[in-house]
Amino acid sequence: MPIKFHEGSKTFHIYNKHLSYITCIMENGQMENLYYGKAIRDKEDFSYLHEEIMRSLMAVCVPEPGLLSMQYTKQEYPVYGTGDYRNPALTVRQENGSEIVDFKYVSHEIYGGKKKLAGLPATYTENEEEATSLDITLHDPVMDTDLVLTYSVYEDYPVVTRSARLVQKGDQKIRLENVMSVAVEFPDMDYEMIHLSGAWARERYVKTRKLEMGIQAVQSLAGTGSSSEQNPFIALKRPHTTEDTGEVFGFSFVYSGNFLAQVEVSTYEMTRVMMGINPQGFSWELSRDEEFQTPEVVMVYSDKGLNGMSQAYHRLYRDRLMRGKWRNHARPILLNNWEATYFDFDEEKILNIAKKAKEVGVELFVLDDGWFGTRNDDYQGLGDWFVNKNKLPNGISGLSRKIEEMGLKFGLWVELEMVNKNSDCYRAHPDWLIGAPDRFESHSRHQHVLDFSRPEVVDFIYDSISKVIEESSISYIKWDMNRYMSEPFSRGASAADQGKTMHKYILGVYELYTRLTERFPDILFESCASGGARFDPGMLYFAPQTWTSDDTDAAEREKIQYGTSFVYPIVSMGSHVSAVPNHQLHRTTPLSTRANVAYFGTFGYELDLNLLSAKEIEEVKAQVEFMKEHRDLIQVEGDFYRILSPFEGNDTAWMVVSRDKKQAVAGYYERLNKVNASWMRLRFKGLDEDQLYKVKWEDKCLKAYGNELMYAGIPVDRDYCNKTNGDFHSVLYTIEAED
């Protein structure tokens, strides 16, 4: 078993071949974190890792002559009020106004497999041998409250997952005001913090900062989503860690709402990482026999650099977070009509676009916004999930049938969490809006947020959209969400329960996803939130792909997809070839480069193919054929490697290598041409050093061994780049092992 409890030293050792995580019961009954890092040999006693010394101003939490102080101890789950003056993982308001808590060890359970988290997405196992789990139960006798810390370690991944659960056993009501999912402490501060930051159309840019004493944090208060501004992920890496070497610790939050990821460095250079639901705007009352479960944090340890961390997340999320029919299944090549028509379409126009899509080999046609209610613009119609017969006289059922008769699958866009005031839904249920009755209701994109914290709202939307799906032949649903929450107040909740609203909203979204995916298990769901404002592990549990960004410009997508790959597998990244000039930046990039970027994702088109020249249509046909030939490798069977960062220079490169190292596809992208440019060699990664490969690109072919391709590299033809497409040139390499 990869979790052992050593009774004599009261130590838990959680480990596999990749990592060790060691925690122990201290003399005051609280838990201490002794070590987290590269796997070390198991033994009875690691108590030498506990450090204790008399310091001025410290509060000692054991009888004299003891020296145990929480201020200088690497705690497993720090709380408020017993002498630790750093931020706590847990804040509980009691009936007498006190926030002092003291949870002491009571018992533990070690078991095979991994339990589900009630109402929440989480990683999972399919048999007990895949992982081992540990529940440590702590108890506060004054409140008569249990705190259960849950750990799971996978057998084959460098992963430990963490969550916490509070159970109120006593008669008094307690109010949770801060409940982190995880706290981990490191003995030094020699780290750099990586986070993925941005905004609409420039999501998940890679940011790195050196840790300093004090607090550094990223967060979301968006309410409806994890946000474009900050992704629910951070990593700590050693200063000399690269993409391929060195230590890195990743923390990824399996949640889609408000979050806080915080790193606090003490004046003694100890580093505390905490991650969980953002305490701002959150409070949760527990009465006797009630409990609260936090979402899960997935921690990855890598001693093989950032690529090693990312590949661990990719494999785990692809294999044990995504579920259902589309887990480990290549995605259909689609065409979405949004940038081709926006709201201006009718059945004839849609059928003409779909017909051309079929001619080039596309497999799925997706009808985007504008098909329902009075939805002729974004001022009206949201909430009314019935067909606009003026645009589609034969309804979705008739249109989907005609699309299928062409030999295409049919997909549909929805935005189920939102409502326009100009809608039948709002006129019938004005109290279903999130918003305080005595405050102005802020609007965004002319729409408002439905109160998904209320079960009757979720029921109504479920019934409405299920009817549309049942009556039609739908293979794919794009579930959009186009605004953050403001005035977070539920008209269906009491004053005491308003602090539950934003978390209950996300639980309502999960509930609707659960009901729809269970009722329609064959449908491929893609999540979307004004592009990538809710690209998080919580969504991937229900929808195995996410629209990566509303920015479809190929050059910008290099940055967005590069940053996204730090955590998320490329099969989860919605990526399309769009028209030029690009609709977001008005930039023109070569058709080949647009495809060469989009290949490293789900791949599809977002334009009217009828507007392309005959030569361009032939190029599109070749692109579709290439993707069909290589999508199993790219999306399902391969490991993704980052090679050159768009955040560090003019060039970007990445590649996918099959697990058996027999096949690979690599992309190289040059943003701006340079006059009389210097020589450059592209060094591949992940190949078998002793294997002879055939490399093809453009009109060239080369045979070389893996060690040549990885260490000597392959020259990039700068002159060819200058003579062909000008700026934004790219090269696609296919690599095949020779017998």
Give the ranges of each region predicted by the language model.
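Short Pro-Gly-centered flexible turn/kink motifs
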Residues: 98-105, 284-303, 728-735
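Active-site neighborhood of glycoside hydrolase catalytic domains
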Residues: 393-395, 427-429, 433-588, 602, ...
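Carbohydrate-binding surface patches
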Residues: 234, 243, 646-689
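C-terminal beta-sandwich/jelly-roll accessory domains of carbohydrate-active enzymes
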Residues: 672-739
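Aromatic-lined carbohydrate-binding/catalytic grooves of carbohydrate-active enzymes
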Residues: 326-460, 476, 486
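Glycine-rich, aromatic-flanked loop segments that form ligand/cofactor-binding clefts
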Residues: 71-72, 76, 81-117, 245-258, ...
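Conserved, mostly hydrophobic/aromatic
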Residues: 18, 164, 289, 335, ...
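Polysaccharide-binding surfaces and accessory modules of carbohydrate-active proteins
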Residues: 5, 9-13, 17, 31-264, ...
